[in-house]
Amino acid sequence: MKKTLMLQERKKSFPIRRSTFHHSTNTQISMSPQRKTPKIKIGWFTFSCCEDNTVVMTEVMNDHWQEWKELFDFRYARALQSKNVIDEFDIAFIEGAVTSENHGEKLKEIRAKSKKLVAVGACAVIGMPAGQRNAYKKKQKDEIEFLLTRFASLPKVLKVSDVVKVDAEVPGCPMDPNQFLEVVNRVVGELKKEAASKKL
């Protein structure tokens, strides 16, 4: 009885440690979690437009949600979430034309923080139909002058490429979902290729 109690006390003092070696190969198993590939940081920004491209984007996202949730980190997308940040983006998507000084300043800030910038939709790509006032006659311009002053509008509506460098474009009003997906895949491929070349 006394010997049994001594053995029990010894087991408490020296607990059995499980081996981290695989029995068949005698190779140590790593206990640390595998590193995941960093997600691609996305920003989705809207300027002067009807936002129909945002609708198309969300429809495409619904169809590709299972793959996109593993691939993308939406850092800024007000149509999708309430918490948004402007820090660093791998891809910034811009819809809408540039109609004010504030738009221009914000667009330049986004460009400076983005590896790739994609203009989506007609207003962003060609400045229309948001830029119809560019073709107004003097009388029409005089009639809307008070509105331009109130909203600190630019004298002329600009497309995105008038203000910053654009890496890719998806035209249309609204944009074609298949063409949008094609551009997304192409730009993602370019980013992956650039990342791989840096590792060499």
Labelled PLM ranges:
Residues 2-4, 11-13, 26:
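Polybasic, lysine-rich low-complexity intrinsically disordered segments
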Residues 8, 22-23, 28, 34:
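Low-complexity, intrinsically disordered or signal/transmembrane-proximal segments
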Residues 32-200:
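Iron-sulfur-associated redox domains of electron-transfer enzymes in respiratory
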